[in-house]
Amino acid sequence: MSQPTAGVPELLVGQPDWHAVLVKVLENFQCVTGTIHRTDPSTGLLTLVTQHGIPPQVLPMLLPKIDNIPFGKGIAGCAAQRKEAVQLCNLPEDLGGVAKPDARKTNVQGALAVPIVGADGKVIGVLGIGKMQTYDFNVHEIADLSAVAALISAKI
């Protein structure tokens, strides 16, 4: 893996292009799919800011479900509620019930979501990445993605 934050700070100047930020994060972590959600202060829901790599055949069905996510629902919602990283090394066979049935249709297997925490300690978003093969993210990768989320927290 390249330096996990490589190129990210440069993309966070001014008004960030969140899709470009996400694509750079995916490249750095050798992942093919990901999302950035922001917590909507008026609804308390995680609102989709951008996504990349969700297969086009499932996007129309999945988009309404990932557009606004309650804390505690799905991988991103669980990361937000728990205020800690949530990962699934084999999303289609998630036996813990974290992944929602429609998420399994993406064919993403290894998935990791980390909360984006603001200066006040509140969850202001979630950064999620995924691989198309079964994958168990190690503690260093989890810490690295959390470091990227900390960079994002200053701008989201």
Model-derived segments and spans:
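Signal-transmission linkers at sensory-effector interfaces
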Residues: M1-P16
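Flexible loop/coil segments at beta-strand boundaries within sensory signal-transduction domains
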Residues: S42, V117-V123, M132
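Acidic/proline- and glycine-rich, intrinsically disordered low-complexity segments
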Residues: L59-E84
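A short, aliphatic-rich beta-strand micro-motif
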Residues: Q109-G118
